[in-house]
Amino acid sequence: MEFKKFLSFAIFIIIIISSNNSVYSIEPDIFVQSTVNRASQALDDKFSKKEKIDKLKSIAKETVDIQGISFYTLGSYRKNLSDEQKKEYTKLFEQYFLKSFSSRLAEYSNPHIEVQSKKKLNENYTMVSSVLVETEMRPEVKIDWRIYTKNIE
């Protein structure tokens, strides 16, 4: 049940595809499938738990807009904070996010996530729908990814 709640949180994850990065030219659904494939490889049984956690943290740092999520969680309180407070909050949030994200997923074995569809919401946002395929040990879980495509020129 905890893992299902965690995956529900994934709906709010904003992933940035930046032109400074080779993934800019990749379609959002292909980017998501590539990212989940990398995560699945990181969860291979040949790696120790620490190695899995390190690999998952690296993937998250590359693909998740952790600062954007931290500001989103602050909501309207953000405007009342100084730049130094925002910087400290973002640093602590990143530590918490990476620890929570990686340690929960590191316990998961053989995840198989399939991208099912994508829907362009506007010029910058695309919603990619996927599913964690059910097994004898777990039910099917739907995961929606909100992808923000950022063109830095």
Residue ranges and their predicted role:
Residues 1-10:
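Bacterial N-terminal signal peptides that target proteins for export
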Residues 9-18:
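Bacterial N-terminal signal peptides
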Residues 16, 57, 106, 119-121, ...:
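Sterically constrained small-residue positions within well-ordered secondary structures
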Residues 19-25:
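Sec/Tat signal peptide C-region and signal peptidase I cleavage site
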Residues 27-105:
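Early exported N-terminus immediately downstream of N-terminal targeting peptides
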Residues 39, 118-153:
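Exposed beta-sheet edge and beta->alpha loop/turn motif
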Residues 105-117:
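A short, amphipathic edge element
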